[in-house]
Amino acid sequence: MRKIAIDAMGGENAPEAIVEAVLKAKPELPEDKFIFFGDEGKMKELLPADDDQIEIVATTEVILDEDEPVKAMRTKKDSSMVVAANWVKEGKADALLSLGNTGALLTCGIFIVGRIKGVARPGLMPTMPVESSDDGFNIIDVGANATSKPEYLLQWAEMASCYAEKVRGVSKPRVALLNNGAEFDKGDDLHKEVYQLLQDSSLNFTGNIEGHELLQGKADVVVTDGFTGNAVLKSIEGTGSVIIHMLKDGLLNNGVKAKLGALLAKDALKSVASRFDKDKYGGAVLLGLNSPVVKQHGRSDARAVYYAVKQIDKILTEDLTNTFKQEFSK
């Protein structure tokens, strides 16, 4: 039975939303066991007793969003996140899911779970929506690394392409390099060198992609440095929130005609909202570690966490980590 470590105390809606999500997913995943790390009293109130798929590990501390990541990992040794990461390191759990402090989770992933031998730097990779289909695209790195070298981006592209193929079911994933122009000689020295490395690789490299093309479905995997990727991710998320707010305000607060228009456009608006629903893709994966570590947004509700649980099950089913270990040990 596969064992998934759940940081039950991370996120704004913990532990209730996390427990609700796991209990919803559990009947669909009979081969998985869920190990909850957190406040034992709260866990016992929310979880069924005598369930072979559920285990509770009592912890006494919580890493907060305002905590400094490295210091939190070192000083809050009995926090739900740190204890869960140690269980994964020791082989008592196969994967880790957390909604907690992103920096702390990255730190725990890198320094406790550990890098795969041969991987220079792990990369953080979410799946984002596109306008043309429900397939979405992966973008890596979105903030695990402040600085980058060409070989890092090549490895991220290789791992992300493998993820897109095995977990998302994309045949021959199209890999693109985020750059400031489509031409091969665009960008700084880093991007020019990465372009050549990708072109010389066995990946299905389609060239550069510009920021305005990201949501158009032109690539299945987009590789970028962590600084740029983080800025792009937050820009996409922020723009989406603003558009939704503006639509709601415009349709509901501009008289009877606007409300009638909203009613007539209801199905179309639902279709658009569904297409750009990033929750259905699960969380962001820290690729390149000895075991899967998935970060879901701290504000996630039970529905979003449910998809992250299903995502981890798929990653374990496809044995993605061992694929990476075999590839990078050559």
From Swiss-Prot:
KW Phosphoprotein (keyword) present: no
Asked if the Swiss-Prot or TrEMBL record annotates the protein with the keyword Amino-acid biosynthesis, the reply is no
> Which key words tag this protein in UniProt?
Cytoplasm, Lipid biosynthesis, Lipid metabolism, Phospholipid biosynthesis, Phospholipid metabolism, Transferase
Q: List its EC numbers.
A: 2.3.1.274
Enzyme class, spelled out:
transferase
Q: Gene encoding this chain?
A: plsX
One protein family per Pfam:
FA_synthesis
Query: Which Gene Ontology BP annotations are present?
Result: fatty acid biosynthetic process; phospholipid biosynthetic process
Q: Which reaction does this enzyme catalyse, per its entry?
A: a fatty acyl-[ACP] + phosphate = an acyl phosphate + holo-[ACP]
Q: Fill in the subunit field for this protein.
A: Homodimer. Probably interacts with PlsY.
Report the GO terms under cellular component. Answer: cytoplasm
Protein name from the UniProt record? Phosphate acyltransferase
The protein's matches in NCBIfam families, at most eight in alphabetical order, are given as: plsX
